[in-house]
Curated annotation (Swiss-Prot):
<comment type="similarity">
    <text>Belongs to the EF-1-beta/EF-1-delta family.</text>
</comment>
<comment type="function">
    <text>EF-1-beta and EF-1-beta' stimulate the exchange of GDP bound to EF-1-alpha to GTP.</text>
</comment>
<dbReference type="InterPro" id="IPR036282">
    <property type="entry name" value="Glutathione-S-Trfase_C_sf"/>
</dbReference>
<feature type="compositionally biased region" description="Acidic residues">
    <location>
        <begin position="92"/>
        <end position="111"/>
    </location>
</feature>
<dbReference type="GO" id="GO:0003746">
    <property type="term" value="F:translation elongation factor activity"/>
</dbReference>
<dbReference type="InterPro" id="IPR018940">
    <property type="entry name" value="EF-1_beta_acid_region_euk"/>
</dbReference>
<dbReference type="InterPro" id="IPR053836">
    <property type="entry name" value="Arc1-like_N"/>
</dbReference>
<keyword id="KW-0251">Elongation factor</keyword>
<feature type="region of interest" description="Disordered">
    <location>
        <begin position="71"/>
        <end position="113"/>
    </location>
</feature>
<dbReference type="GO" id="GO:0005853">
    <property type="term" value="C:eukaryotic translation elongation factor 1 complex"/>
</dbReference>
<dbReference type="Pfam" id="PF10587">
    <property type="entry name" value="EF-1_beta_acid"/>
</dbReference>
<dbReference type="GO" id="GO:0005829">
    <property type="term" value="C:cytosol"/>
</dbReference>
<keyword id="KW-0648">Protein biosynthesis</keyword>
<dbReference type="Pfam" id="PF21972">
    <property type="entry name" value="Arc1p_N_like"/>
</dbReference>
<dbReference type="GO" id="GO:0005085">
    <property type="term" value="F:guanyl-nucleotide exchange factor activity"/>
</dbReference>
<keyword id="KW-0597">Phosphoprotein</keyword>
<protein>
    <recommendedName>
        <fullName>Elongation factor 1-beta'</fullName>
    </recommendedName>
</protein>
Length: 222
């Protein structure tokens, strides 16, 4: 989906729709594409654009120095472009190759019937071999220490030692919460069928020498 000039109301509406099921502009972690769009937006959007507002506040929580370290990404912005309607869905080549009913006279002979059955079987085989979509979620976790003397670097190292099938750790940073105490904010992507969020937070809380509590700051389906 191409997004037009985000300095216009229409462009912001397009961006809000684009971010409805995305945590970031490109991929599962923040990138230079987010920085580009963030600078174009310029200021926090109105509350009637909840997805843009959520994304804007998340990017704004990082410093300029942190943003410069992000990798490149693909921006959806099309300078000066008007929002484009979605292109018609391409026909599935597999479907085009299969004539479900064949052709011929009204009275099909045995050979025509055999050919049709073979085509139906080939079509069913092709459909059954297509990979199923894997449901994933992007999660932002707030991990809070006991006090300002907690070794936050070691706490992050402990959290990242957690390995589960379908779990991928992402970017992290320290966020001040007051009285000299910082919390660890860390991203992860999970496969919904393989990773239980409750089990993941319980495993983090098992590092009781470092961790006081774990909260889910943001949860988005991918």
């Amino acid at each position: 989906m191409a997004v037009g000039d985000v300095k216009t109301a229409q462009g912001l509406n397009d961006l809000n729709q684009y971010l409805a099921e995305k945590s970031y502009v490109s991929g599962y972690t923040p990138s230079q594409a987010d920085v580009q769009v963030f600078e174009q937006v310029g200021k926090a959007p109105a509350a009637n654009l909840p997805h843009v507002l959520r994304w804007y506040n998340q990017i704004a929580s990082y410093t300029s120095a942190e943003r410069k370290t992000w990798s490149q990404g693909t921006s959806p912005l099309t300078a000066g472009a008007k929002p484009t309607a979605p292109a018609p869905a391409a026909k599935d080549d597999d479907d085009d190759d299969v004539d479900l009913f064949g052709s011929g006279d009204e009275e099909e002979d045995a050979e025509a019937e055999r050919i049709r059955e073979e085509r139906l079987k080939a079509y069913a085989d092709k459909k059954s071999k297509k990979p199923a979509l894997i449901a994933k979620s992007s999660i932002l976790l707030d991990v809070k220490p006991w006090d300002d003397e907690t070794d936050m670097k070691e706490m992050e190292n402990q959290v990242r030692t957690i390995e589960m099938e379908g779990l991928l750790w992402g970017a992290s940073k320290l966020v001040p919460v007051g009285y000299g105490i910082n919390k660890l904010q860390i991203m992860c992507v999970i496969e919904d069928d393989k990773v239980s969020v409750d089990l993941l937070t319980e495993k983090i809380q098992e590092f009781e020498d470092f961790v006081q509590s774990v909260d889910i700051a943001a949860f988005n389906k991918i």
